[in-house]
């Protein structure tokens, strides 16, 4: 299964993952489990009062798990300079310092600057608030024109990887091709050989329309260029 394969890839390698909602009991439980099993090195973001208060209230032991308070980060000035540079005139220093009080922006900058390898968020933050900092500060990987997302759905022995359910609202044909290629690449990174279907509201030509036409054209193009079924 995908989760097992991912654990094998990172276990014992000291991969640092930032958790933006270190005050949430679900996040703390996950961080404790990941650390105890040496899967990753979790980093909880939040104030000491928030993190300790949650742990005490829920009888959780977060001792030994790294914690970073955005209000007392020793490299904050360096982070501010870097973020001002990345925003290219869209945010001045004052606005950047305000934004970095949010653990979403702060955590994203930790990843961007190499202090962490990845970020997990969305337990309490909305999808938009979780994704926006990455779109602004990390952006698309080299060779990609857009950023897309994928969901992993697991039920018993079945697993599906679905993209793109949260980023691109009305993709055109070119976008659909790129999203499909990105999702297939992600599947392989997860240890799954992709077998792809493009979904719309038409079944075997039962309906026509712009959305159906885009999917049909994207499917035809992918059959010619893709190295998957």
Model-predicted regions and their roles:
Residues 1-229:
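Anion-binding alpha/beta catalytic cores of soluble intermediary-metabolism enzymes, centered on
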């Amino acid at each position: 299964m995908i989760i097992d394969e991912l654990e094998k890839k990172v276990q014992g390698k000291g991969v640092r993952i930032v958790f933006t909602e270190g005050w949430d009991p679900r996040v703390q439980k996950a961080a404790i489990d990941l650390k105890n099993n040496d899967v990753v090195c979790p980093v909880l973001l939040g104030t000491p009062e928030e993190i300790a208060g949650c742990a005490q209230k829920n009888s959780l032991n977060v001792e030994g798990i790294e914690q970073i308070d955005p209000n007392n980060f020793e490299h904050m000035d360096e982070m501010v300079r870097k973020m001002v540079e990345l925003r290219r005139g869209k945010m001045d220093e004052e606005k950047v310092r305000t934004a970095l009080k949010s653990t979403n922006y702060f955590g994203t900058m930790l990843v961007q600057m190499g202090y962490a390898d990845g970020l997990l968020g969305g337990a309490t933050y909305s999808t938009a608030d979780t994704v926006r900092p990455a779109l602004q500060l990390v952006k698309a990987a080299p060779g990609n024109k857009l950023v897309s997302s994928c969901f992993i759905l697991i039920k018993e022995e079945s697993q599906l990887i679905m993209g793109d359910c949260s980023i691109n609202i009305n993709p055109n044909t070119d976008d659909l091709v790129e999203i499909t290629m990105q999702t297939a690449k992600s599947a392989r990174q997860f240890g799954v050989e992709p077998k792809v279907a493009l979904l719309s509201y038409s079944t075997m030509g039962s309906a026509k329309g712009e959305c159906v036409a885009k999917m049909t054209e994207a499917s035809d193009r992918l059959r010619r260029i893709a190295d998957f079924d």
